């Protein structure tokens, strides 16, 4: 007889990350191609010397550095730190939603939302996207007396789009004050074209808004797992009640602090990536691909039924991309040479398949 497990696990898939095939170009996981800056590397080396000690569970120094980085309006008690922003997503579900409660998100969106909600015994309410973008009006109409938490993934993963900043403010104002809104900004550093929302002001001026960010993308610390949340102090205290103790290591905290100190250099890297994003997007559109305007470090190719063929042929060309069955392909913007290889394959593929 096997151990009795929770029924919520039935049908729950195991998370499958982007593949890493030796010898191939990996454009599947939205990682930065850049390694740590020398100053960050040095901070990591120093922190390695104390890995025999437990880390600071309160992340005091990191919270202070984040408060300074985010601006004078942000205080350390308005910041929670987690082992990547995905753990903070999980904590938000834990502090808001019990069995039978509803957690809303646009769909398709970040894959981890669904299992986090399902494990909690809550109900995931998936509101279809409109033109590959969160449909805030439809989400507002879908709110019920059981809605406890709303995720707004902005930019949205995997479709790369952002909502209109003014529409986001109107949405926040219209949502009942007892429903928590989580603005998930893992890719916020890549937003351009005047589309950056004033999300921090929303979080600091309202008790039911929290902003999630991460060091995994633009800051290049995906392997160290550091994310953070900004919100009302009572909300932050609630998050701290359900955090896994010592989840953010000494090394991760030191690297994050050093990255904030070098944020100017790191943000220059995002400018270079945005330039590549523009180049790759333009070339793909000129070749005949339809894709929404990206404000992230990846592109969304809504290929529908042709998704599997594109992915398989890309693999044959030693390119690893991220498929979403029958919907499309997410392609990370890589180094220029990697992007050139992608463009050569993709332009050839569409020329052959659309004859």
Swiss-Prot record:
Q: PROSITE patterns this protein is in?
A: AA_TRANSFER_CLASS_2
Q: Keyword Transferase: yes or no? A: yes
The Gene Ontology biological process terms listed for this entry are:
L-histidine biosynthetic process
Enzyme Commission code(s) on record: 2.6.1.57
Tagged with keyword Cytoplasm: no
| Gene Ontology MF annotations | aromatic-amino-acid transaminase activity; histidinol-phosphate transaminase activity; pyridoxal phosphate binding
InterPro entries linked to this entry: Aminotrans_II_pyridoxalP_BS, Aminotransferase_I/II_large, ArAT, HisP_aminotrans, HistidinolP_aminotransfase, PyrdxlP-dep_Trfase, PyrdxlP-dep_Trfase_major, PyrdxlP-dep_Trfase_small
What Pfam family does this protein match (any one)? Aminotran_1_2
Q: What class of enzyme is it?
A: transferase
Q: Which reaction does it catalyse?
A: an aromatic L-alpha-amino acid + 2-oxoglutarate = an aromatic oxo-acid + L-glutamate
Q: Which residues carry this modification: N6-(pyridoxal phosphate)lysine?
A: 217
Q: Which UniProt keywords apply?
A: Aminotransferase, Pyridoxal phosphate, Transferase
* Cofactor entry: pyridoxal 5'-phosphate
Q: What does this protein do?
A: Aminotransferase that catalyzes the conversion of aromatic amino acids and 2-oxoglutarate into corresponding aromatic oxo acids and L-glutamate.
Q: How does it assemble?
A: Homodimer.
Would you identify the family this protein belongs to, as annotated? Belongs to the class-II pyridoxal-phosphate-dependent aminotransferase family.
Q: Supply the name of the protein.
A: Aromatic amino acid aminotransferase
> Per the UniProt entry, what species is this protein from, by scientific name?
Mycobacterium avium (strain 104)
Provide the gene name from the record. Answer: pat
